């Protein structure tokens, strides 16, 4: 809750008085700065050392220590943060009382008199005016800010367990949350700066100026916090700590950002970019590019009720196909295990409900996918299979042993939890759902194998869990797995997918999707249809998420158990989603390269439009589709937009109110100029070859779209084995020039020829169509003013030019 007005005033004036007498830690620099490869160490008069590492032309790292010994953090040690930075041309010089570190991208200025830091871009423009570092020696600042944060958040509540776990009570106890030796980083803010990111730490805003964020993974509250903030001014900060930390963004003082570390450490990265999207790219370069799931994983995943058995699930699988509702994957909740909630490494199939192997072969090795049992039968129907897991294990054992192997040192000899899952992989399991039980729980009494306590390990555990899961699957199968976990921290985006956990598929989940996207997390989803009062509205949001999860673990979310209108709505959205798979997967590949999310918050997509600063109930789904949720109105940015349901073209720069059709759940608009690749209907991704592609074109002056593709399953994309196809549309007067670019790049299984079916929205019927200068007779014009043109691309490496007159 907010602090009381009188306390706020008292703290404000107390702080102003204290600032006059504070000893800033970096109050003076002695001579003799040490320089090594892209790293500069400055000894300070107070016996501390400041280390500035130039990571790239846009990224610098700043560390403060009592000794000139800047050892790797656990995030580096365990392979979560990038350490293999390329050499950057950087120089250090003295100029009018300041030490200046210069690269082609920025100037880092350290004032010798005040100890303050500032950042300028390559052109000399001031990006960050003032950065000050306060440590435990400056207790008044740390204490006053800490008191204010405790008033704001209240006493921290711990314990209670995870829903479904046998240990779950829901009863939480209050404890103090601020450490005894904090450090504070203070950054001056420009008057009009807005701030985004922080992971899933706010369910009231996506623009965080004026509030504080608590960076600690907490069940059902802040499950994937990210110690990362993104400024609208084109810079960002990553606070490199796994201890409890806070961002106070213009709340305590309107013109200040405070980074409060409970551990006393000070280690942060500053990133510069010409746009917010560039800064996100820098952040995921540091913490890991987003994971690219297998192509099929971007479709619908369905989890049945916990009392279902193999026959119920197989009947569901057949019913989806009969109802012509595309679905990619089934997962099984804990009932697949012989022992419910089995945390051990000796778990076996529940032979009464889900016999994944013949009972007489339980002890037989090696394991294999049995051709007559349910796993193989699912695969024959085109489905994938995932299993629910719960984990309660010290993951530093495997992490430390990996380092020991690399250094040719003895290993621990202790158990690595994930290794036993390889038997299930051999039996045909395609992925895993990682439950938060015990991992999102706190373990204040636990001493980890690496010597750390839970204060340092709790946030880090949220990354090690999906990391070790992915590494195990990849090491054993050599292909991409489907795995997701509702917890996370910095770096989690690199190791798998996420959901909003046990928070349903309503407005809370929406905030999580937007805030995580603004933090470089691409593969987000929710428990679609849970905790929603309007099923159609829940479907509208759910089917326009990066991947779709229907979790019916205690419910009956099967579409055939819905009223007819809802069942038909479900079918429509599932089919639309399936047809959009080339568009969605292309956005996923882009995200894996740049950190650009599939669900794009409006201020990220339209940063120069101040009306989008804190828009919640709408977002861009990829580059060209705008989704409005839980409302019949939305704001259209400047330009022209097409109502997808009605076909009506509308001018932007205003808020519009539109009728939502009875069999739809929200608003959907197409950006004028859009080119959207879709597939013809399939029951699952990969049912038919993708050598025929439909292009939905909405001409508006000149526009382009680039389709990204790869093999959809291997890790070859990491080697650059992807392909791009650029489409260009130029509308001038009554003529449309459309160019299908030749495919650039390659991947295994890439089509050598392709058929394009163009569907071009037009005002009136054209007179003629030409393909590569030859008049075409293979076109028609519909009553809804859509020109349909068939183009057979005999050689995918060559351009095709189409002219419509």
Please give the residue ranges for each predicted region:
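Catalytic core of carbohydrate-active enzymes
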Residues: 471-472, 478-481, 491-497, 518-522, ...
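Surface-exposed interaction regions enriched in Ser/Thr/Asp/Glu
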Residues: 792-805
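Bacterial Sec-dependent N-terminal signal peptides
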Residues: 1-37
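Solvent-exposed beta-strand/loop surfaces of large extracellular or lumenal domains
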Residues: 74-90, 643-663, 768-790
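A low-complexity, Ser/Thr/Gly/Pro-enriched, surface-exposed linker/loop concept
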Residues: 53-101, 137-140
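Short, well-ordered beta-strand segments enriched in hydrophobic/aromatic residues
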Residues: 52, 62-64, 101, 105, ...
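Catalytic and substrate-binding clefts that recognize carbohydrates or anionic sugar/phosphate headgroups
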Residues: 92-294, 304-305, 310, 317-322, ...
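Aromatic- and carboxylate-enriched substrate-binding clefts and catalytic-loop regions
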Residues: 77-79, 129, 326-574, 603-607, ...
């Amino acid at each position: 809750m907010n602090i009381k007005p009188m306390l706020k005033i008292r703290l404000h004036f107390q702080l102003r008085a204290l600032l006059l007498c504070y000893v800033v830690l970096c109050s003076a620099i002695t001579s003799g700065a040490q320089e090594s490869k892209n790293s500069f160490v400055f000894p300070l008069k107070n016996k501390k050392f400041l280390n500035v590492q130039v990571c790239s032309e846009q990224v610098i790292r700043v560390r403060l220590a009592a000794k000139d010994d800047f050892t790797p953090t656990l995030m580096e040690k365990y392979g979560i943060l990038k350490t293999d930075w390329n050499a950057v041309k950087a120089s250090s010089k003295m100029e009018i009382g300041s030490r200046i570190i210069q690269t082609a991208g920025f100037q880092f200025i350290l004032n010798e008199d005040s100890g303050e830091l500032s950042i300028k871009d390559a052109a000399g423009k001031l990006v960050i005016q003032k950065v000050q570092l306060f440590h435990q020696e400056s207790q008044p600042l740390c204490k006053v800010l800490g008191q204010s944060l405790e008033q704001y958040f209240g006493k921290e509540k711990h314990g209670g367990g995870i829903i479904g776990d046998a240990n779950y009570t829901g009863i939480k106890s209050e404890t103090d949350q601020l450490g005894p030796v904090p450090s504070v980083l203070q950054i001056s803010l420009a008057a009009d700066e807005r701030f985004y990111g922080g992971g899933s730490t706010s369910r009231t805003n996506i623009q965080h100026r004026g509030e504080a964020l608590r960076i600690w993974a907490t069940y059902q509250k802040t499950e994937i916090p990210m110690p990362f903030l993104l400024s609208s001014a084109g810079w960002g900060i990553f606070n490199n700590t796994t201890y409890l930390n806070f961002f106070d963004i213009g709340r305590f003082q309107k013109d200040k950002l405070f980074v409060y570390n409970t551990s006393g450490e000070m280690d942060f990265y500053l990133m510069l970019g010409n746009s917010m999207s560039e800064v996100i790219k820098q952040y995921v370069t540091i913490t890991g590019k987003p994971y690219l799931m297998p192509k099929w994983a971007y479709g619908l995943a369905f989890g049945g009720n916990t009392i279902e058995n193999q026959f119920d699930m197989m009947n569901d699988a057949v019913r989806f196909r009969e109802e012509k509702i595309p679905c990619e994957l089934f997962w099984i909740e804990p009932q697949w295990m012989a022992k419910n909630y089995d945390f051990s490494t000796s778990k076996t199939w529940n032979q009464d409900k889900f016999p994944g192997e013949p009972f007489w072969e339980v002890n037989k090795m090696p394991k294999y996918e049995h051709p007559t049992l349910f796993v193989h039968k699912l695969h024959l129907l085109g489905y994938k299979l995932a299993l629910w897991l719960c984990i309660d294990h010290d993951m530093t054992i495997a992490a430390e042993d990996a380092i020991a192997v690399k250094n040719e040192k003895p290993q621990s000899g202790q158990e690595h939890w994930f290794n036993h899952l390889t038997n299930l992989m051999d039996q045909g399991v395609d992925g895993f759902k990682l439950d938060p039980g015990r991992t999102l729980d706190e373990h204040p009494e636990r001493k980890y194998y690496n010597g750390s306590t839970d204060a340092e390990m709790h946030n880090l555990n949220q990354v090690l869990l999906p990391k070790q899961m992915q590494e195990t699957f990849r090491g054993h199968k050599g292909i991409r797995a489907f795995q997701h976990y509702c917890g996370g921290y910095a770096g989690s985006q690199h190791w798998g997918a996420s959901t909003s956990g046990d928070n349903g598929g309503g407005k809370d989940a929406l905030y999580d999707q937007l805030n995580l996207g603004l933090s470089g997390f691409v593969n987000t989803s929710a428990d679609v249809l849970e905790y929603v009062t309007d099923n159609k509205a829940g479907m509208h949001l759910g089917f326009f998420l990066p991947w779709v999860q229907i979790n019916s673990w205690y419910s009956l979310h099967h579409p055939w158990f819905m009223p007819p209108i809802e069942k038909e709505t479900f079918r429509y959205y599932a089919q639309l989603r399936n047809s959009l798979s080339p568009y969605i997967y292309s956005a996923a590949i882009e995200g894996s390269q740049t950190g650009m999310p599939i669900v794009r918050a409006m201020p990220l997509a339209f940063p120069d439009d101040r009306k989008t600063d804190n828009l919640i109930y709408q977002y861009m789904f990829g580059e060209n589709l705008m989704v409005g949720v839980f409302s019949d109105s939305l704001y259209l940015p400047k330009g022209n937009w097409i109502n997808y349901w009605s076909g009506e073209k509308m001018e932007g720069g205003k808020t519009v109110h539109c009728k939502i059709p009875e069999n739809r759940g929200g608003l959907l608009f197409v950006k004028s100029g859009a080119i959207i690749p879709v597939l013809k209907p399939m029951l699952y991704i990969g049912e038919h070859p993708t050598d025929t592609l439909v292009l939905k074109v909405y001409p508006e002056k000149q526009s382009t779209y680039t389709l990204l593709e790869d093999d959809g399953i291997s890790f070859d994309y990491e080697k650059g084995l992807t392909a791009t196809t650029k489409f260009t549309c130029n509308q001038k007067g009554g003529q449309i020039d459309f160019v299908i670019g030749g495919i650039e790049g390659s991947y295994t299984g890439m089509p050598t020829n392709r058929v394009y079916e163009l569907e071009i929205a037009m005002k009136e019927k054209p007179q003629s169509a030409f393909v590569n200068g030859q008049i075409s007779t293979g076109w028609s014009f519909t009553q809804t003013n859509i020109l349909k043109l068939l183009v057979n691309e005999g050689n995918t490496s060559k351009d095709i030019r189409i002219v419509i007159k």
